């Protein structure tokens, strides 16, 4: 339905990775080396560049696992672009690194935002993370999911009003809708 091959962490141990010389798999990076720079205005609206080390990314993922567990991330849907920190770090890499299924939308388009309810049902999604502007379109054009697989929604990267938060809860039919603050806050 999304035109995307489902890739699980188990795929990394397939024959395709056995042909890669083991020396090239070695990581020379140290925990305190810079891993990436996120340029963002985030929830606060103040532009900035935020440097993350391998240690800070690891701490984020381990903190998420400790505080939220991984069960609700069993089938994660990423509607966000993966070049976007929110889409990459917490919405994609976190569930995937801990062995959960990750469904990534092939290309972002406004039409995609008119289908989240259907996608949740078709793919048995348990978790998705999003941004408030996404919900502006989705709540107007998407029917709510009919199945009962969805367990948790995060919404962040921009201010989330109490009114929109309640609308998302009603649309999804769950109470577990959280205003998430990212690693650039």
Q: For the regions a protein language model found, what residue spans apply to each?
A:
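Conserved AMP-binding A3 loop
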Residues: 35-62
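Short beta-strand->loop structural element characteristic of the AMP-binding/adenylate-forming
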Residues: 1-11, 48-51, 78, 100-108, ...
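ANL superfamily adenylate-forming
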Residues: 1-32, 153
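Conserved pre-ATP/AMP-binding loop-to-beta segment of ANL
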Residues: 20-39, 46, 69-75
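Conserved AMP-binding/adenylation subdomain of ANL enzymes
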Residues: 58-75, 85-126
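Conserved S/T- and glycine-rich ATP-binding loop of Class I adenylate-forming
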Residues: 34, 40-43, 76, 82, ...
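Gly/Ser/Thr-rich phosphate-binding loop
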Residues: 125-130, 139-185
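Structural detector for helix-capping/boundary residues
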Residues: 32, 54-55, 123, 175
């Amino acid at each position: 339905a999304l035109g995307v091959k489902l890739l699980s962490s188990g795929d990394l141990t397939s024959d395709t990775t056995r042909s890669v010389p083991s020396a090239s798999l070695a990581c020379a990076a140290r925990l305190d080396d810079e891993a990436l720079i996120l340029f963002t205005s985030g929830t606060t609206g103040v532009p900035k560049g935020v440097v993350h080390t391998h240690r800070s990314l690891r701490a984020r993922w381990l903190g998420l696992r400790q505080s939220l567990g991984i069960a609700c991330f069993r089938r994660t849907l990423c509607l966000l672009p993966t070049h976007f920190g929110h889409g990459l770090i917490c919405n994609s890499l976190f569930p995937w690194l801990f062995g959960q299924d990750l469904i990534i939308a092939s290309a972002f388009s406004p039409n995609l935002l008119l289908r989240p309810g259907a996608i949740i049902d078709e793919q048995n999604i348990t978790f998705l993370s999003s941004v408030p502007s996404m919900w502006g379109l989705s709540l107007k054009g998407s029917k709510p999911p009919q199945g009962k697989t969805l367990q948790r929604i995060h919404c962040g990267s921009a201010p989330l009003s109490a009114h929109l938060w309640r609308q998302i809860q009603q649309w999804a039919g769950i109470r577990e809708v959280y205003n998430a603050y990212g690693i650039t806050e």
